Amino acid sequence: MGSCWSCLDRDSVPHNHPTKFKVTNVDDEGVELGSGVMELTQSELVLHLHQREAVRWPYLCLRRYGYDSNLFSFESGRRCQTGQGIFAFKCSRAEDIFNLLQDLMQCNSINVTEEPVIITRSSHPPELDLPRGPPQPAGYTVSGFSNGFPGCPGEGPRFSSAPRRPSTSSLRHPSPGEESTHTLIASEEQSHTYVNTPTGDEDGRSRHCLQPLPEGRVPLPAQTQGSDQRDPQVLLQPGQVKFVLGPTPARRQVMKCQSLCPGMQDPPHHNNNEGPSECPAQPKCTYENVSGGLQQGAGWRLSPEERGWSGLAHRRAALLHYENLPPLPPVWESQGQQPGGEAGDDGDSRDGLTPSSNGFPDGEEDETPLQKPTSTRASARSHSGFPVPLTRRRGSPRVFNFDFRRQGPEPPRQLNYIQVELKGWGTARPKGPQNPSVSGAPGPTPHPVRSSDSYAVIDLKKTAAMSDLQRALPRDDGAVRKTRHNSTDLPL
């Protein structure tokens, strides 16, 4: 990745400049390679060098960054001017660089999406409280994300974060002695994937993403996660760490609908739409699969004006809410109850197939507490004409029913022919359905045959004579002027 040499007019930069900082580039062993001036503009990091062109790293291409007591380091992506690599700079104002970079990230609405991470460490303590802000003591550094989230402090051996070539096989090197270093590359057991994407979301959402993570504690067995958990969490368990994000916009709408309709929290376990769980304040709406972390027995409904907004929120926040998985394709199963049947014959009236959203039948009330959504109940009515064998009814096991009933082959269609009345062939034939027994006409005969009621007689001699006469006519290409001497018109 090369070295960073002296910067032009380094001494002219004041110590407390708001956007320019005096930095010194260091290598893997902590050896100083050169000095320069790091400037933070509105869109990129700029390193001014002496008698050389400035090196620029756009904020959109920064994968991660962090700081220690006197060391600021970051990891650049492949689209940067320097290519992929990790750069470390000594600076007495490393914390100021970090804070300013976070503010610029927020102004540019740059978010870093982190995939679900499971960190397995054999030496991980069972209980640990994470600090709310960036840690102050030296010895380790918080690996910060571009949206302001501080990462977990590095444990075990410290790793240096000085600049290295992208082609280096291992980006982990031991720290030189007592030198305080910044860890940007985690251990092999830890798998982080960050995607730095610019978004044009509203300011409220950006502020939500830029809030620091709350304190992470080990969840006790007696504690239960409530459905109104609104802040992201870091759950520390023996041997692993789980990152739990906050509720998505669609999830917030569901909780809002739940607060407006308290009766929806205890839905009846049957397939009838007419029940006390129907929300009186809002009309009946379509089913939205946003019950990832909520109780499974609630069939949530959204208002009609929020349907399009919820679908848009699903597409915009597809990388942020992992509990909002897409619904499974419908699987045909035995219908639990006829729409118009009586309440007492719920087990004997199963003569239809209905798609299941969860993959299991919605049979007896005391076995399956899940309530089918509105779209599923509508599909049940449309497929109520398919018979189900007796073995699939009340005593059948609670498994998938892949017994697809298809209709039999269609009856053969009968084609009706109408006899065309020909002139000069005797009396007319009666019109009506005729048996298409004759498939083709007989071949032409060289001599006249007896006239038939259904076929015409072709005069072959006359046809051949007319054909020869047509071939004998000179072809007129339009280049010869016609007169009375060379006219091609035949005499009448």
From Swiss-Prot:
PTM info: Phosphorylated on tyrosine residues upon stimulation by BFGF or NGFB. Phosphorylated by ULK2 in vitro.
SUPFAM superfamilies: PH domain-like
Keyword Lipoprotein: yes
Domain IRS-type PTB span(s) in chain numbering: 13-115
A Pfam entry, by short name: IRS
A GO molecular-function annotation: fibroblast growth factor receptor binding
Subcellular location: Membrane
UniProt record, GO biological process: fibroblast growth factor receptor signaling pathway
GO cellular component: membrane
Keyword Phosphoprotein: yes
Region annotated Disordered, chain positions: 122-230, 328-414, 426-454, 469-492
Annotated InterPro entries: Docking_Protein_DOK, FRS2_PTB, IRS_PTB, PH-like_dom_sf
Residue spans of biased composition, Polar residues class: 371-382
Gene3D superfamilies reported in the protein's UniProt record: Pleckstrin-homology domain (PH domain)/Phosphotyrosine-binding domain (PTB) (2.30.29.30)
Topology term for the membrane: Lipid-anchor
Keywords, ordered alphabetically: Lipoprotein, Membrane, Myristate, Phosphoprotein
Lipid attachment site numbers (N-myristoyl glycine): G2
Quaternary structure note: Binds NGFR, GRB2, PTPN11 and ERK2. Binds FGFR1 and NTRK1.
Described function: Adapter protein that links FGF and NGF receptors to downstream signaling pathways. Involved in the activation of MAP kinases. Down-regulates ERK2 signaling by interfering with the phosphorylation and nuclear translocation of ERK2.
Name this polypeptide is given: Fibroblast growth factor receptor substrate 3
